[in-house]
Regions:
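Short coil/turn segments at the loop-to-beta-strand junctions that recur within blades
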Residues: 317-318
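Aromatic- and carboxylate-lined catalytic core of secreted/periplasmic carbohydrate-active enzymes
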Residues: 176-179, 191-313, 322-332
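Catalytic-core region of carbohydrate-active enzymes that cleave or remodel glycosidic bonds
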Residues: 119-121, 137-216
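Short, flexible/disordered intra-domain loops and linkers
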Residues: 64, 100-105, 179-188, 218-222
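Active-site mouth of glycoside hydrolases
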Residues: 1-153, 163
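Hydrophobic anchor at the start of a short beta-strand
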Residues: 50, 168, 299
Length: 332
């Protein structure tokens, strides 16, 4: 069947054909784009960037199979409308490698259009499913990465920073939820762990939630009320990050039982002004630290789940930090 008679009951029989749509690819529906603009403005008032996904493969209308001329017509219109908003990022596609009728030449053509026609030079990237795009391309401002393994993604953040030399946005490290798909049923505790792991490796993780509820709607695609636990901990995390010196964190030396982040601009300094050590799923009762004999550090032990900060005073030289519980992060 085509999408003209698609319903909830027969969705699994959908063949991808679009003959029943009779879609007019020569005219735009202004009300549709006006609605998107209203959403962008609402996000702007909340201080949120709108990462505009311009194309995606989950298509029952035929938009992913348009001709080159139809594609270009669409892209020019979208760029002309949305580039005027200051809180817009460009995501060329969600899971670009599943759009089987598009090739690298197509994606590079779209990127060139954005670079030429967006006078405000908004941030640009492209999101993968299984295959990475070439993030070293000059038009790519940051890497937009989906998880690569069942158990690890955040753990590769520092490796990707070195490989691509650009900010690493982990916009799909799985979702907290309970759906019967591996990408959407991790616990809130695991989501929080992945966030801290990514940040202490110099990355920028993104949150999503896929709990099945009585309305049979997922927050991930419909919005509404969040049902999980991880989102409650991210405001606490943001508050800590806003207090760190400098404009961002970079990964520093890693030990067997923790990862460490320091201010990006201090990375080459012998002794930094700030260290953030994350113990992930490790739970030592105490840990000894030493940098030099002169520099004084204020020690704070952060409980990333219970959202508490325990101050352990100002010390220098060799110092022992008491942890006594799991989910601990040390701030010096």
């Amino acid at each position: 069947i085509d999408s003209n008679i698609l319903t909830k009951e027969n969705f699994s029989q959908y063949t991808g054909k679009t003959e029943g749509n009779h879609w007019d690819f020569t005219r735009f529906n202004p009300k549709h784009f006006q609605h998107i603009e209203k959403c962008i403005l609402k996000l702007q008032k909340l201080g949120i960037e709108a990462d505009i996904i311009v194309m995606h493969p989950y298509d029952r209308w035929g938009f992913s199979n348009m001709t080159k001329e139809q594609d270009d017509f669409y892209w020019k219109y979208v760029i002309a409308r949305f580039s005027a908003f200051r809180n817009v990022w460009w995501s060329l596609a969600n899971e670009y490698d599943l759009l089987r009728k598009k090739n690298v030449e197509d994606w590079e053509r779209y990127a060139k259009m954005i670079c030429l026609k967006d006078p405000y030079n908004h941030l640009r990237s492209i999101h993968n499913c299984q295959l990475f795009y070439d993030y070293k391309r000059p038009w790519v401002t940051h890497c937009s990465i989906q998880r690569q393994e069942l158990y690890q993604t955040a753990e590769y953040t520092d490796k990707w920073r070195m490989e691509f030399g650009k900010p690493i946005v982990l916009d799909e490290i799985c979702y907290e939820g309970n759906i019967p798909f591996s990408w959407g049923n991790i616990t809130g505790e695991e989501m929080v762990r992945r966030f801290w792991e990514a940040i202490c490796r110099g990355g920028y993780p993104g949150h999503g939630e896929t709990y099945i509820n009585l309305n049979d709607k997922l927050w991930w695609s419909h919005g509404g009320k969040l049902l999980g636990e991880s989102w409650k901990r991210f405001g606490f995390l943001i508050d800590i990050l806003q207090e760190t010196p400098g404009l961002g964190l970079a990964p520093y030396e890693k030990r067997l039982d923790y990862v460490c982040a320091v201010p990006e601009e201090e990375w080459r300094n012998e002794v930094k002004s700030y260290y953030l050590m994350y113990f992930s799923f490790m739970q030592p009762l105490s840990r000894e630290f030493y940098f030099d004999d002169e520099t004084e550090f204020e020690i704070e032990v952060i409980d990333t789940w219970n959202m508490t900060i325990e101050k352990q005073g100002i010390k220098k030289g060799c110092r022992t930090v008491l942890l006594q519980d799991c989910r601990k992060t040390v701030s010096l």
